[in-house]
From Swiss-Prot:
It comes from Synechocystis sp. (strain ATCC 27184 / PCC 6803 / Kazusa). Residues 328-355, 442-476, 565-590 are annotated as: Disordered. The gene is ccmM. Belongs to the gamma-class carbonic anhydrase family. GO terms for cellular component: carboxysome. This is Carboxysome assembly protein CcmM. It is found in: Carboxysome. Its main location: other. It holds the Pfam family RuBisCO_small.
Length: 687
């Protein structure tokens, strides 16, 4: 009797639930005055999916529950054959903006056949997704075109760009500039295997068992018996790892950028001759799997040197080499760096907990010391009195024998305690090349260890960055915009260069090259940039992003101008630096549509409206300038070209142009790139 009652209640609940679903669908406000979806009979649309408007679903398509495909504003949508749309996917379009489909018709969203859109992804038109693409979990594709076979990994943003076919967008990447999209790596076999696993795993359970009407509520007549599943307990291998958190973060960062992980080992004799033997490469793409493989190498080659290799598989080159084990280290004890990391203060003196009370080492200097040790360099010590310091006469204080960070910092602090009233600097020594790679002043007689490198330091040496105060900007004198630019270039595997010029040569666009910035570590590059700004105070300085594989420039951005004040090693104020950094038209900014104006030069609202109108019509923007004498003769000179089509970047470039030619006439040009003619000439600045 009880079983019959329960069965009757279940049947009533099932009937009421299905009726409620149909009623809710009929009463939705956007379902009125819209075209009905065109769903192929062989396609499967779950009853809990929301499909509204002119959506054309082709054979073999699978739409999982919780998905929302709304063609209520931008229409129509085309979803090609055998497309897999997983749980929680949102597909929507703007009222304006269309893409050209493979059938030469205009669509708000086009999804090619065989494409997989994974859980919680957002595809917002106008968007074109080619055939056999993969859009990863929680990724966003907005106003973009993704070529056939491209793979967009998890938590990525693809906006306002065209991704070439068969390219890989790493997890967490923000691709908002076309030059970023052009430099993406190729999809590897491991990536294809991962995509096939995801598609196959969710495609097996997506085949329909009943009709494909999206308003039909499909519930099983009887629940299947629950089969006990033996779960494998998850063991966090990081608790017993033999590599410190810095190396773990390095591995995660390399994997997030799509790089492979390898390792090499050498005994003490081979290490002196730099004769390394390969440990192999780590299979898989999950950080825990790769970290476990690296730990296995450390256990296997205990008592030897082991270094980690980051591999760009597309360009077949190494992007990083870091020593993670030495003969004195014991695998399984994460002692490296734990004491010093805890002892160093992020905003103050950074005094070691076990050091002498008078030993004072700045946090930035400690980071540079750590970087030297990780690259296998020896550390030397030199000191000088105030009189000898003026003449550059340094006395040798010996070398630090230990290669462990904690012991090296303790020994350095003891040396500082013995020379409290003298200048002290550390020397980075390449034992194989028998040369100095860095000279960093870490202590001064007044107790301030944030000085500049001594006059005898080489051009490739490090510069000790000032320690920021509680309310100051980070990374010494560089602005957050410049730091973000450098970080983005390094993350994409590009090299960093600099150029400088004076006011006279700047007008003629004649730049002199600064010494090359070697190394791929962010702290080293930022320190050398600060040294370059200090060496060329009162001049224009611009940063260059260099694609070493293609041997081309991907970025030219001004980071210092003659009017900027450099005080105590600091670069210009944030407002002036913002103007400088945006003067280049192909900047490396995020381009997310935020506010454009951070500079002292503001564009008139009419100019902003004019620029917005030109860009909306597909025209390019250019500028010309002239002085009063040439203006009478109608003789204009072209400014730096503006290649970007993003409104915020164009406006920032215009502000930079006005600042560069203050006191002159500047006029705005609207250019039709197809007909190669000018459609607008208007003066936006007068003397």
């Amino acid at each position: 009797m009880l079983a019959k009652s329960l069965g009757w209640l279940l049947a009533v609940s099932r009937r009421n639930y299905c009726m409620g679903s149909r009623t809710a669908l009929a009463s939705r406000p956007w379902s009125k005055h819209l075209a009905d979806p065109q769903i192929d009979p062989t396609a499967y649309v779950h009853s809990f999916a929301n499909v509204v408007g002119d959506v054309r679903i082709q054979p073999g398509v699978s739409v999982a529950p919780g998905s929302s495909i709304r063609a209520d504003e931008g229409t129509p949508f085309w979803i090609g054959g055998n497309v897999l749309i997983q749980h929680g996917v949102v597909i929507h379009g703007l009222e304006t903006g269309r893409v050209l489909g493979d059938d030469d018709q205009e669509y708000s969203v086009w999804i090619g056949p065989g494409t997989c859109v994974a859980h919680l992804a957002l595809v917002h038109g106008p968007v074109y997704l080619g055939a056999n693409c993969f859009i990863g979990f929680r990724s966003t594709v907005l106003n973009a075109r993704v070529g056939d076979g491209a793979v967009v990994m998890m938590h990525s943003l693809v906006q306002d760009v065209e991704i070439p076919p068969n390219k890989l967008v790493p997890s967490g990447a923000m691709i908002t500039q076309q030059h970023q999209a052009d430099s993406l790596p190729d999809v590897q076999a491991g990536d294809r295997h991962f995509v096939q696993q995801i598609a196959a795993m969710h495609g097996q359970s997506a085949s329909p068992t009943q009709g494909t009407d999206p308003t039909v509520c499909v519930l099983p007549e009887s629940l299947p018996a629950v089969t006990p599943v033996t779960e494998t307990p998850y063991i966090n291998s990081i608790d017993n790892m033999s590599i410190n958190s810095d190396i773990t973060n390095q591995i995660r960062s390399l994997l997030a950028q799509g790089y492979g992980i390898g390792a090499e080992h050498a005994n003490e004799r081979r290490f002196k001759t730099k004769s390394w033997q390969s440990c192999g490469t780590a299979d898989g793409f999950r950080p825990d799997q790769v970290i476990a493989t690296v730990e296995g190498w450390l256990q296997e080659f205990a008592g030897e040197y082991v270094r980690l290799i980051g591999i760009d598989q597309g360009a077949k080159r190494r992007v990083v080499e870091v020593i993670i084990q030495r003969p004195g280290d014991v695998p399984g004890s994460p002692s490296r760096g734990t004491t010093t990391t805890k002892a160093l203060s992020s905003g103050g003196s950074g005094r070691s907990a076990v050091a002498h009370q008078t030993g004072n080492l700045a946090g930035d200097s400690a980071n540079q010391l750590r970087a030297l040790l990780h690259q296998g360099y020896k550390i030397g010590l030199e000191y000088a009195s105030a009189r000898r310091f003026k003449t550059g006469s340094w006395l040798t204080g010996g070398t630090i024998g230990s290669h462990r960070e904690g012991e090296a910092l303790q020994e350095l602090n003891r040396f500082l305690a013995d020379h409290t009233n003298e200048y002290v600097r550390i020397i980075g020594i390449d034992p194989a090349g028998k040369r100095r790679v860095a000279e960093i002043v870490v202590h001064r007689p007044n107790g301030n260890g944030n000085g500049k490198p001594s006059s005898s330091s080489s051009s490739v040496g490090y510069k000790s960055a000032p320690v920021s105060s509680a309310g100051g900007s980070s990374a010494g004198g560089l602005t957050p915009e410049v730091i973000a630019t450098v970080r983005g270039l390094l993350a994409n595997g590009h090299s960093i260069g600099t150029e400088h010029t004076d006011k006279r040569r700047f007008k003629a666009k004649s730049w002199d090259t600064c010494p090359t910035i070697d190394g791929g570590r962010e702290a080293e590059v930022l320190a050398k940039l600060e040294a370059c700004l200090a060496d060329h105070a009162g001049e224009y300085v611009r940063i260059i992003g260099i694609d070493r594989v293609g041997k081309r420039r991907v970025l030219e951005q001004i980071i210092q101008r003659p009017g900027d004040n450099v005080v105590a090693g600091r670069s210009p104020s944030s407002s002036s630096a913002s103007t400088s950094s945006s003067a280049s038209s192909n900047g490396f900014g995020s381009g997310n549509g935020g506010g454009y104006s951070n500079s002292a030069v503001r564009l008139d609202n009419s100019v902003v409206t004019q620029v917005r109108s030109l860009l909306a019509q597909g025209y390019k923007i250019g500028t010309e300038h002239t002085d009063k004498r040439r203006f009478k003769a109608k003789s204009w000179q072209s400014c730096a070209p503006i290649t970007s089509t993003h409104e915020s970047e164009v406006l920032r470039a215009l502000e930079g142009c006005l600042a560069d030619h203050n006191g002159e006439y500047v006029r705005l040009l609207g250019i039709d790139p197809t007909a190669k003619r000018r459609v607008l000439e208007t003066i936006i600045q007068r003397p």
